[in-house]
Amino acid sequence: MAIERTLSIIKPDAVAKNVIGKIYQRFEDAGLKIIASKMVHLSEREAGQFYAVHKERPFFKDLVSFMISGPVMIQVLEGESAIATNRDLMGATDPKKADAGTIRADFAESIDANAVHGSDAPETAAVEIAFFFPGMNVYTR
């Protein structure tokens, strides 16, 4: 197994519910280290650029609107198979289909307000980390 890095975003719905600490605890309990983090309120331009891969999808406009509706917590996670571990912790995109005990099952409201984002592959993780943490001001600990 390899040490990986992945980007995680705690979305506006979960930030508003004040569950950042509970989600961070799940990351750490699963062996992931939080090696960079910041809270930001994304602009429409930033959210549009970050989710540009979905630009032609029917949900793009709603996704951008949701992501700018309040602050988000952005973090880089590091650990053994960090991408798969984080995706397992998050659960299915639709919280109604997410396994009990996953972040989305416990904290998400809907398929749109689904609490968290996580990179889906090493290549996207690298791009997403560089988007929010340019210059790789991210440190192993």
Curated annotation (Swiss-Prot):
Catalytic residues, chain numbering: 117
Binding-site positions, ATP: 11, 59, 87, 93, 104, 114
Subcellular localization: Cytoplasm
Signal peptide extent: none
Alphabetically ordered keywords of this record: ATP-binding, Cytoplasm, Kinase, Magnesium, Metal-binding, Nucleotide metabolism, Nucleotide-binding, Phosphoprotein, Transferase
InterPro entries: NDK-like_dom, NDK-like_dom_sf, Nucleoside_diP_kinase, Nucleoside_diP_kinase_AS
One Pfam family per UniProt: NDK
GO CC annotation, single: cytoplasm
Cofactor(s) the record lists: Mg(2+)
EC number(s) reported in the record: 2.7.4.6
Catalytic activity, as annotated: a 2'-deoxyribonucleoside 5'-diphosphate + ATP = a 2'-deoxyribonucleoside 5'-triphosphate + ADP; a ribonucleoside 5'-diphosphate + ATP = a ribonucleoside 5'-triphosphate + ADP
Keyword ATP-binding in annotation: yes
Molecular-function annotations in GO: ATP binding; metal ion binding; nucleoside diphosphate kinase activity
Biological process, per Gene Ontology: CTP biosynthetic process; GTP biosynthetic process; UTP biosynthetic process
Top-tier EC class: transferase
Main location (coarse class): cytoplasm
Function: Major role in the synthesis of nucleoside triphosphates other than ATP. The ATP gamma phosphate is transferred to the NDP beta phosphate via a ping-pong mechanism, using a phosphorylated active-site intermediate.
Assembly and oligomerization: Homotetramer.
NCBIfam families: PRK00668.1
Entry-linked HAMAP family: NDP_kinase
Family listed: Belongs to the NDK family.
Protein name: Nucleoside diphosphate kinase
Organism: Aromatoleum aromaticum (strain DSM 19018 / LMG 30748 / EbN1)
Lineage, broadest ranks: Bacteria, Pseudomonadati, Pseudomonadota, Betaproteobacteria, Rhodocyclales
GN (gene name): ndk
